[in-house]
Amino acid sequence: MIARDRNWLLIFAVCAALAVIYPFFADGYQLTVIRDALIFGLFAASLDFFWGRTGILCFGHAAFFGIGGYIMALITLDDAIPFGSLLGILGAVAGAAFVAAIIGYFLFFGGIRGSYFTIVTLAMGVICQQAAVSWSSVTGGDSGLIGIPPIEFDLGGMHVDLSQDLPSYIFVAAIVAMVVLALWSISRGRWGTVLTAIQDNEVRAAALGHNAPLRLLVTFVLSAAIAGLAGALYVCMAGLVAPDLSGLLLSTEVIVWVAVGGRGTLLGPVLGAIFIQRAQQTISSFNPSLWPLLLGCVFVVIVFVLPDGILSIYARLKALFKGRRRAQ
């Protein structure tokens, strides 16, 4: 195992340990704040899995988050379907993946890459948000849909109700940990190696026998499916869904979370989302108008001081201490 993998697993283990002990020191409100931040972290990790491994930026990624949220809401809103929560989650994942498969097929097999891909996905996000506003008979229009029930299911004869703060926090934290670890395993395996080769030189990768458009499509679909899962979890915890969840603002914010946390690290975007969401909650409680300015300053500082994101701090400190030891 190379040093980079050991560092990642060590940071992951520390974060998991902190997530386990956090409920012992937090009240209900703090648990809900971190729970929601973890969901956004899962959303950020889904974008990073595609953007970080392929180098192609999807600027409308919130569309998949919103699609997942609306599908979850429509399936569970009346609370009349048996196993509604499970069907809602499966429907959200499948719906987001289906839309990504259709769009991605024409883009990747049509040779659309780089800034052109970014522009097309930006338009996709705008279209999805406008559809959510205009299709008011289904989506509720500008007001969205409210009264979405929390996730409920039976596990080994025990009924689990995620309307409470602690169970919902544990459930979300477990989902995020498992998904991030699974994505990291994929990224560090042969699939991730081929994606890196495609990112470096797609023509050369194709000459070696790799079907680059298909690889990119599958990665894009998996990324969208996880974004749909995050959207489904969010609307169940929040109890509502609105067009803003598929809008340009959220698509921009998730890019910032990934950049702040560290693109290509998967765990970094989760930490970036938690850091920014927590900072926003704290600062906005004192002066809401101050937050956009501070966010811009934080982003500029990260770009110049920590271009690899906050997750690179550990590696930098480790290298610094090693350098001092050698100097002595």
Task: Label each region the model flagged.
Residues 1-328:
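Transmembrane alpha-helices and adjacent helix-loop boundaries
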